[in-house]
């Protein structure tokens, strides 16, 4: 679709520097009506300034929606049922938010009769892929505008100059400087850019927004209990809470105990490596609790199969394939494994650490009678192990015999 053919576009709008510049750029370059959509995913910011900024630039249709419960219930919790970590470390706080934003953006575009959607992701990052794969999965004929791939504002310096020229307010950090590139929601916050672009440079404490330093955390552990039903957390310290409220409370506890910091160099889907500082206090606690719950409720082979599939599942979410058939297939398998993951986990939070100190479940596969060092009263016949060992040793013995005759093992 040519520039002149775009009459109305729905912009995923945070109210930050990038999307505020994009809003004005769309108006001046495309000459089209811009509809803004701001999703409240628990980023912890007052969203009214985003509305006022949009009004300042003459936007008539402004959508600001509270999606926190939907975000946690339908996106975060399903992901945590899989104990999802990208490259063994990243809890996917940014990745998991994009499908929901894109989904609602497409719904709004159809409702207001827009002929295009736009986002503020750069041409170097993963988010452009995540947004657009979701757009096309939900509306195959959608027109997508990606300003970072079109305009000549190819650096933060040029972006700031454009903002000053068009009188776009520029946020400052605590030192009065332009802020890091930040993404935040109820699950996490991330910081990138500036001095963090050098992976050898340690981040200043000012970078961290969601956690205190573990060194500054209390000298006494905080003890908590999390209740699970079918793989999802439902209560904290015996009090039933909504998904978003529970995660928010875990964030508070994690923050106070210095939990959830990660300095990560990751492999982006587009091919380059990038460095980010991630803070996921509540998610780090939740992951430890869920894994502990599974240790007594999942069958060994079922658990090992699930663990073997997790990296692929994580990769699909990281790369933007939330709405793909393969992600849905894996989700069905993961959810099937969670029917018995019900019970209570007790944890200690201490100076950046999450320590499981107890777990119990009505579906526990842990049988004290079988595993005890004391008299098991015939629950387990130790002599049965002889045949088990001999059968498992058979191929090793045969291989060793061949090896002695000069053959290959």
Swiss-Prot record:
EC number, as in UniProt: 6.3.4.5
Keyword rRNA-binding: no
Keywords: Amino-acid biosynthesis, Arginine biosynthesis, ATP-binding, Cytoplasm, Ligase, Nucleotide-binding
Gene giving rise to this polypeptide: argG
PANTHER family in UniProt: ARGININOSUCCINATE SYNTHASE
Assembly and binders: Homotetramer.
Main location: cytoplasm
Binding site for L-citrulline: 90, 95, 126, 130, 181, 190, 266, 278
Catalytic reaction(s) noted: L-citrulline + L-aspartate + ATP = 2-(N(omega)-L-arginino)succinate + AMP + diphosphate + H(+)
Gene Ontology cellular-component annotations: cytoplasm
Keyword Transport included in the entry's annotation: no
Binding site for L-aspartate: 122, 126-127
Biological pathway: Amino-acid biosynthesis; L-arginine biosynthesis; L-arginine from L-ornithine and carbamoyl phosphate: step 2/3
Similarity remark: Belongs to the argininosuccinate synthase family. Type 1 subfamily.
A Pfam entry, by short name: Arginosuc_synth
Alphabetized GO MF terms: argininosuccinate synthase activity; ATP binding
Name of the molecule in the record: Argininosuccinate synthase
Localization per record: Cytoplasm
């Amino acid at each position: 679709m040519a520039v002149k053919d775009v009459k109305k576009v729905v912009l995923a709008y945070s109210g930050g520097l990038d999307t505020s510049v994009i809003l004005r750029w769309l108006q001046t370059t495309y000459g089209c009506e811009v509809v803004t959509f701001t999703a409240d995913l628990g980023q912890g910011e007052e969203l009214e300034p985003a509305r006022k900024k949009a009004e300042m630039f003459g936007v008539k249709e402004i959508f600001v929606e509270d999606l926190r419960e939907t975000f946690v219930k339908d996106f975060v919790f399903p992901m945590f049922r899989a104990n999802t970590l990208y490259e063994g470390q990243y809890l996917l706080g940014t990745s998991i938010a994009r499908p929901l934003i894109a989904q609602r953006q497409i719904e709004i575009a159809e409702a207001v009769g827009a002929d295009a959607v736009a986002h503020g992701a750069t041409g170097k990052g993963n988010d452009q892929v995540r947004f657009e794969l979701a757009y096309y999965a939900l509306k195959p004929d959608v027109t997508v505008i990606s300003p970072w791939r079109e305009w000549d504002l190819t650096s933060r310096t040029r972006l700031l100059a454009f903002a000053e020229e068009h009188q776009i307010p520029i946020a400052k950090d605590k030192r009065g400087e332009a802020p890091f590139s930040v993404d935040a929601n109820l699950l996490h916050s991330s910081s990138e850019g500036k001095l963090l672009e050098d992976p050898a440079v340690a981040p200043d404490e000012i970078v961290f927004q969601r956690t205190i330093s573990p060194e500054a955390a209390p000298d006494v552990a905080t003890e908590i209990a999390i209740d699970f039903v079918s793989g999802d957390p439902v209560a904290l310290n015996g009090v039933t809470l909504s998904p978003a409220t529970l995660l928010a409370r875990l964030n508070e506890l994690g923050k106070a105990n210095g939990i959830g910091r990660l300095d990560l160099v990751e492999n982006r889907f587009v091919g380059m490596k990038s460095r980010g500082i991630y803070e996921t206090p509540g998610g780090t606690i939740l992951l430890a609790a869920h894994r502990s719950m599974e240790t007594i409720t999942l069958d060994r082979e079922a658990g090992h199969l699930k663990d073997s599939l997790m990296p692929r599942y994580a990769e699909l979410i990281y790369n933007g394939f939330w709405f793909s058939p393969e992600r849905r297939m894996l989700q069905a398998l993961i959810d099937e494994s969670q029917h018995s993951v019900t019970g209570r986990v007790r944890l200690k939070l201490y100076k950046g650490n999450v320590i499981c100190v107890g777990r119990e479940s009505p579906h526990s596969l842990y049988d004290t009678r079988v595993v005890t060092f004391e008299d098991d009263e015939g629950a387990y016949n130790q002599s049965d192990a002889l045949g088990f060992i001999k059968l498992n040793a058979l191929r090793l013995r045969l291989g060793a015999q061949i090896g002695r005759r000069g053959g290959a093992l």
